[in-house]
Amino acid sequence: MVPVIALVGRPNVGKSTMFNRLTRTRDAIVGDLSGLTRDRQYGEAKWQGRSYILIDTGGISGDEHGMDEKMAEQSLLAIEEADVVLFLVDARAGYTAADQMIGEHLRKRNKRSYVVANKIDNIDENLARAEFSPMGLGDAIPVAGAHGRGISQMLEIALREFPKDEDELEEGEVEEVAEGQEAKRIPGPSEKDGIKIAIIGRPNVGKSTLVNRMLGEDRVIVYDEPGTTRDSIYIPFERNEEKYTLIDTAGVRKRGKIHEEVEKFSVVKTLQAIKDANVVIFVMDAREGVVDHDLNLLGFALEAGRALVIALNKWDGMTPGERDFVKIELERRLFFVDFADIHFISALHGTGVGNLYQSVQNSFKSAVTRWPTSRLTQILEDAVSEHAPPMVGSRRIKLRYAHLGGANPPLIVIHGNQVEKVPKSYVRYLENTYRRVLKLVGTPIRIEFKGGENPYEGNKNTLTDRQVNKKRRMMSHHKKADKKRRDKR
């Protein structure tokens, strides 16, 4: 499970600055989803091979009423959702009554909480630690969020009990496929727990109904118990002798209950389900068409690089004209996930639900297959031969060879010269070429460029004495010849 870190504290202690710094390497993927997050902002970040979800909360002033009312509702929810709470205080302003009240609340919640003394510039760190020691939450971690000072130490402390990502592939870790061998699947979770499938979507689009339908007749359910964290449920089951694990974020329900209930949407559970899954089934309400919240949620899956299958639910009962309009909208607005299979289903009646499994299998296979360097390089050479990279100044971008850099999603590393100047349109061309030739379906593909160093850069020509003398004689000869030509004129 991906750990969740919440930033809490009173106003103007630097929470948003800290949030922006921590999510800078990977763009924040959620920013105040209207009607869903309100005062909370969610982001995804990674530090030394560990992914985590970051929550930025509104400030807590604590200047009136009791603590339960002073603590904003959204900040309370963020604390409940979090595995770790980073309690930011202002080292310049010192220990305040609001800090004391927030600290007391955190102690009562028995959360893993750390005091972070921000704005430590030009302040004695030992004095800052002593200033905030009365809160009883351990020594304060001194940082300067605006300048990045102390951030590594803070993250080391916050994440030290969490393992590195299971699918983290360091450079060179992917084994090479021998020449002449066929592409192979990288051994993954399917061999043990089955393909992990996360079913996500907006509230009330039919996720609960689809979950129950997939776990219904002709399925072998091993067990159905609530997960230990934030009510997510991991349900192993089998279908046609294939193993799967369904990650259900909609909460506990009776197996025989098919009708849809109003679901409480949780950004954290959705993000965690996506990160923990091998394949995401994204459910949309066909009768409502494509809405902005759908695009935001699809952005989660795309950012995480997960294989994707799209299910248009409630397809039954729509007129041919309505269906045609929805298909046009899908083509127009979902162009950025055009690699995903789209299924038109009725979770309530079961129409088309069985077809989802083949797309899940195909998507997972595409996401974890590996190819030899020779194969990827040949595809690159053919692509360049058919459509060469553009000229940059008087020189053409050169792409030399390619190799596999990771899986789930496939990462293809291309080496060459001036690669930092490759335009986005050409990157898209290469992505489409690899997708077409390798017959990839249902998975995003990522391309990373690495420039080659010039081995002669910085070297100067060193002439021998003989070469120097010859150069002088030639220059003298040319000067005499030029003088004769001028005299004749």
From Swiss-Prot:
Region (Disordered): 451-489
GO biological process: ribosome biogenesis
Annotated Gene3D superfamilies: 3.30.300.20, P-loop containing nucleotide triphosphate hydrolases
Record-linked CDD domains: EngA1, EngA2
Domain (EngA-type G) ranges: 3-166, 195-368
Domain of life: Bacteria
Domain KH-like, first and last residues per copy: 369-453
Assigned keywords, A-Z: GTP-binding, Nucleotide-binding, Repeat, Ribosome biogenesis
Residue numbers binding GTP 2: 201-208, 248-252, 313-316
Basic residues bias: start-end ranges: 469-489
Assembly, per entry: Associates with the 50S ribosomal subunit.
Protein name, per record: GTPase Der
Annotated source species: Pseudomonas syringae pv. tomato (strain ATCC BAA-871 / DC3000)
UniProt gene name: der
